[in-house]
Every structure is written in structure tokens, then in C-alpha cells.
Amino acid sequence: MTDIRDPELPGLLLRTERDALIPLLRARPDDDFALRTACPGWTVRHVLAHCSAALIRVVEGRVEAGGFTPEENDRDIAERADLSHQQIVDELERGMTEAGPVIAAAAHRWYDGIALGEWVHAGDVREALGVPGAYEGEGLAPALALLAGLTRVRKAQPLLARLDGHDAPLVLGADSPEPAVYTGSAATLIRLVAGRPLTGTRYELSGAREADLLFFG
């Protein structure tokens, strides 16, 4: 299967998520930023600081080879220790607004994965805040399109995803005459590939194990 990159898709995803997430964050009390998330050791504030730092590094051309290591992530979060919660939200809004054109201009898909990861982290924040539909919303369609392209390029586990409410299946991973088959909601698929909690979900998976679908964590 051939796959043509849509360079505008990451920016669309980031702007769509910006318009949903930023107003939500501005309306939350300070105590909510101390809530724990699905990311081990990280609160809502930690996740937001990581996301804003990652996007600003993209905008300013400061992404080093090898990506975002745990040490770099910890450093980015520590550097924002003196910022207020809303200052971090301000920086995140800037990153979600300005990173799209930079990602579109890149001659590779690596930055596309950053945009998708930001959207997943936004879901982590929503879930910690108790907002329904954590990994759903207006950004789900572009997120699925990005996921499909990235998994094919990186030759991930072949998977035919039969998603609830979708007429056509979503094809993920390397070309294969016998892909694994997933049947369930798109939001649960996101949880599977991102290694997020599956408590209370329903789905069917044949031809692969849950661990085989983990694309990023």
C-alpha cells in the first residue's frame, strides 16, 4: 500500500485540539493541575509543561537528534517550575498555533508523530480531569489519519481496524495479506496503541496481542 503524506494534517490536529483544550484549561481551578494522569509520575501540570516545551522546541528548531528522552523531558518540566499554571497554558496555546507550519515544512514524518503524541497527551489530561470522551472529539479523525500513515511508514504491527460508526476499516502497520483484526471504538484503539488504561472498554482483537499494538507510550 502506498501512502502520501498530508503535510497540513498535523497542524490541523493541533489547532483543532487547541480550540477544545485551552478553554477547558483556563476554566479549571489550580488544584486540578495537581491531579495524577495515566503517565507514571506526571500530574496534569507535568503533562502540559512537557507538551508546551515539546512544541516550542519544534517552533524554535531546537529538537535534537534522537527525540525527547526522559532526561530531556524532566529538564523541560523543571525549567518551567517557576511558571504559573496559566503561563504554561499560554505557552501551550502558542505551540499548538505555531508548530503546524513548521511541521508541514519538514521533509519527514518524525514531527508528525509529535503532533499525534500531543493529542494523546491532551486526552490524558481530559481523563485526569474527569472529562468524558478523553480520546475522542473533533481531533479524532485527523489523529486516526496520522496514526495510519505513521504506522505504515514505520512498518508497525499489521492491523485491520473495524471501528464502530465507520463504514470502511482503518488499515494500520506494514502491508500484510493476513493482518490482525481489531473491532471496537476508535477511542479504545487509541488507548491500545498508546498504552493507556483499558478499564471499562470493550473490543475484540484477533491475530495479535495487546502488546503488539503498542506504537508509543
Q: Where are these predicted regions, by residue range?
A:
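Short, helix-capping/interhelical loops that line the mouth of catalytic, cofactor-
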Residues: M1-L9, A53-A104, V131
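A non-catalytic, amphipathic alpha-helix used as a structural packing/dimerization or gating element
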Residues: T16, A20, E91-R94
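Helix-loop segments that flank and shape redox-cofactor active sites
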Residues: P23-W42, P101-R109
